[in-house]
Structures are given as C-alpha cells and as structure tokens.
Amino acid sequence: MIQYFDKLSLETKGIIFMILSQFFFATNDAFIKHVLAFYKNDTSYLGEIVFIRGVFVIFFIGLILFIKKNLDLKFLLTSKHLLIRGGMEGICAIFFFLGLATLPFGDLYVLLNLAPIIITASGAILLKEKVGWRRWSAVLMGFTGVLIVINPTKLEFGFAFIFPLLAAAFITLRDTYTKKFEQRYDSIQVAFVTGFMVTVVFGIYMLFHFKAIKLDDIFYIFISAILLSFGYIFAVATVKIATISL
C-alpha cells in the first residue's frame, strides 16, 4: 500500500491530502457546531471552546514532534514565517467560527467553497503557476456550482455572510504565503505553530467574551482537537507537495 502511494504523482498525492484535510476539518467543525448548539449558538462561548480545543491540539501535535525528536520550541516560536502564517489562521478562525455560530452549516460551507476558486486564481497570478484551460474550466464550473447551490435569487443576504467570505480570503492569503516558504519546515512543525497561534488569538478573545462551559462538553472538544490536528497536518502537506492552484 505504501509502495503504491509512493509511486503516485505529487499532484495525485496533493489531491488525496486535500480530501483528507477537508474531511478532518469538516468533521471537527461539526463537533464544534454540536457543542455550540448546547449554548444556543451564543458566540460568547467561542473563546473558551476554541481555546480549550487549541490546548489539546498543541499537546497532541507537540507529542508527535517530541516522539519524532523534532520539537524545538525556541526555533518554532521565533520563526517569523510560521508566526505570520499562524496569525492568518487565527484571524481566519475567528471569522469562520462567527459564521459557524450564525449561519446554517450548509450555507457556511457553500460560501467557503469560494476559497479554492480564489486560491487557484492567486496561484496563477501571484505565484505564476501554470494553470491550463482545464483547471480554469474547473474553477469556473466550481464557481457556477456555488452560485447554483446558493441560488442568489432566493438568498436573503445578511451581515453573517461576510464571515465565511472573509475566512475564505484569509485561507487564500495563508496558502499563498505558505507556498513561499514550503520547504523550510516540516508539515507537523507548521501545524504546531498554527495551533499555537490560533489558541493565543482565542485566548485573547476569551478574556473579553468569557462564559464558562460545562465539563461534559470537554469530550466533544477533545475529539474535535484530534480531528483538527490531522486537518492542519494534511492541509500543510497539500500546499507543500502540490501547486496551490490544484
């Protein structure tokens, strides 16, 4: 099985990693949405929920790095590139979770589907990646699909729609920036600093919007953290081995 995987092209591996990352991200989001439902989607609870999840993420990914003997905190937490990328992820997470708390799950992901379209365009324009007519056709078909699902003629626009759109914009910035230093760091190292920065951002958010959650919800947050950790790792691996316009 491993030998077969090694023979695959980088683009094919990138597709597999992308599918896996989106699966882990979506499943993680479902758990967080489930927890938020206990509190009637009150965003005041977001800070503590995401902060606790972040602590679990840091511990889990940090444990992997420790086992691999690749956990150099001084190196990781003083890297300008990783901290900037992590900051982008933190801002993206804020907008995403505000959307998660105020929009139906399906609507949120439909709007987030704009991110791959924007990323493909940025890969061609900013990184000068070669994007042929087939890939541009896929971009246009994807955008058309988003419009069909959203159905603009019946959609009641509200302020909440701006949240996933801003999240999509920061996803684009994050991946474009990551591509510029892709080979300098291990995917798990990037995922660790990403988890750290998101935790810091929501720790600050929690200071101004704190509401205690129930201990019973910690289990769901823990499962969410494991899923998110793998999502981070595969998302970084995707950008490292394939063109971001993929």
Each language-model region and where it sits:
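Loop-to-transmembrane-helix transition segments
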Residues: 14-20, 71-95, 159-167, 212-234
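Short, Lys/Arg-rich, polar N-terminal cytosolic tail immediately upstream
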Residues: 1-12
